Design a protein with these regions (language model features):
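Juxtamembrane/disordered regions of integral membrane proteins
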Residues: 1-190
């Protein structure tokens, strides 16, 4: 079966369903509201960032410049002292008037790509006419793997709260089930 022709509608519908679920989860139901903490003195912190005029980007502190570290013993000593004294952290700096529209479109495009890849996997694993449960089994598994487990590495390495990691996995399971049920309901010959 040609996955892109026979499965284009479930790809689109499942991408939209997952996008809508993530909107509900994050915005409407606020299930992730407790994933983040506020800073004790947010105004002082943000004023300091403004004064430093840090452009949008991803930052780590202390910054380990591998090139300098490999050749400069003084850099090694300074870095080690900073590392031991703390704090250690990551900062994502966004523009002052960030648009959510671009983020929403980007999320939908990722969902579309994931659904298309799952459609490809399903098309080489399943046959037209395979039953609802068999299609669900394969597609839900692929969906959960796609949406849940990559989040765990990010959480481990970037110090996410356990609750945030659990919520990310739950979101991924719901996303996987949505994709699986949609694909099974719209499976060719089913």
């Amino acid at each position: 079966m040609d996955a892109l022709t026979a499965l284009w509608l479930p790809v689109l519908v499942s991408a939209a369903a997952v996008w809508f679920w993530h909107f509900l989860s994050w915005a409407a139901l606020s299930l992730h509201g407790k994933d983040w903490d506020g800073l004790p003195d947010e105004d002082r912190f943000t004023n300091a960032l403004r004064e430093l005029n840090i452009p949008p980007g991803n930052y780590v502190f202390p910054h380990d410049d591998a090139r300098a570290r490999s050749s400069d013993p003084e850099f090694k000593a300074r870095f080690k002292a900073k590392w031991q004294a703390g704090p250690i952290g990551l900062i994502n700096v966004w523009p002052a008037k960030m648009s959510m529209g671009g983020k929403m479109i980007g999320s939908f495009l990722v969902n579309l790509l994931v659904s298309a890849l799952i459609a490809y996997l399903a098309s080489i694993t399943l046959k037209p006419g395979d039953g609802f449960l068999r299609v669900t089994q394969v597609v839900v598994t692929a969906g959960i793997l796609s949406y849940s487990f990559a989040q765990l590495h990010t959480g481990i390495w970037f110090n996410a709260k356990p609750r945030a990691m659990i919520m990310a996995v739950i979101d991924g399971v719901v996303s996987g089930v949505l994709i699986g049920v949609i694909f099974a309901a719209m499976w060719p010959g089913g």
